[in-house]
Curated annotation (Swiss-Prot):
<dbReference type="InterPro" id="IPR016088">
    <property type="entry name" value="Chalcone_isomerase_3-sand"/>
</dbReference>
<dbReference type="InterPro" id="IPR016087">
    <property type="entry name" value="Chalcone_isomerase"/>
</dbReference>
<comment type="similarity">
    <text>Belongs to the AIM18/AIM46 family.</text>
</comment>
<dbReference type="Pfam" id="PF16035">
    <property type="entry name" value="Chalcone_2"/>
</dbReference>
<keyword id="KW-0809">Transit peptide</keyword>
<dbReference type="GO" id="GO:0016872">
    <property type="term" value="F:intramolecular lyase activity"/>
</dbReference>
<feature type="transit peptide" description="Mitochondrion">
    <location>
        <begin position="1"/>
        <end position="20"/>
    </location>
</feature>
<keyword id="KW-0496">Mitochondrion</keyword>
<dbReference type="GO" id="GO:0005739">
    <property type="term" value="C:mitochondrion"/>
</dbReference>
<dbReference type="InterPro" id="IPR036298">
    <property type="entry name" value="Chalcone_isomerase_sf"/>
</dbReference>
<protein>
    <recommendedName>
        <fullName>Altered inheritance of mitochondria protein 46, mitochondrial</fullName>
    </recommendedName>
</protein>
Amino acid sequence: MRLISKVLVKTNCLEVGMRRAPQWYSHYSTTAGNARVNKKGSKVVPVLTGLALASIFAKKWYDDSQIKKADATSVAVDASISAFPKKMGPPQWPFSTQYELIGKGVRCVSSITFKAYGLGIYVAAEDKHLVSEVLDSKFLSQAFIDTAAPPSPENSHQDNLRTALNDPAKAPILINNLLDSGIRLMSKNTPIKAGSFKLLMDGTKKSVLKNPDSQSQDKDRLEAGFQELHDCFRSVKGLVARDDDFFIELNKDCSMNLSYYARKKDEFVILGTVKEPLIGKLLFAHYLAAVDPPSPEARKEVIDALVSLS
């Protein structure tokens, strides 16, 4: 192990084609001499980013030869892929914070009969309080939610909120206000059919452009953001296997951290960060407020969760 550490240190010092690990990944050391120990006492090789793939040899939570079935800590999305964890975060998963699942469903492409991905939407556990702070605010309640005149005694604020979140005109306003609050979200995209990294990148870009608000945004900023998205995929090429995971973390400033988990290899790859906030905001607003969202089932469950948190 000492010899391996020396080799990793030497590799990590190469500057050509290498990038420093993002700050949000601080709970995993990028210095080979600081390999941490997992619960079983086995060493975890630290992460190398950039053109080198980042491999984490951590405790496996799945059977290599079988799809992980739902249990008390996970929920089924589709029989072709592993169940989605109800909670995801460090130390098992190298994310910036702990996340909780608030919506899941199947994402279809081109035809309702072609199931492409399982989609999960997660919220940062520390940020759940922002839902009520934003959606129960006096301004939004009076202007967009509790607008019946005279007020109906039969409908509660939660009833009115559910109606507003299903309204094509009001939903984008409410969701954009929630995103502006700094709430952290994460999407988990798990291929039901094998695909490619190019498809993942193109699909993310198309989802951004499907948001009608994208048409009124600064084109230069959008193009700069799409270039950052493209740069995140420079280090990975080829096929994406069924049941692998593509993660998009939405930060407080609406920048996005992109990462990929190769399940059979047990490799976690940090793809990079899209700093332009327009991309992250447009993408997650499309997930949560679109008339034709990537997964209507996931959006419905997210609405139910937001109502219950308000």
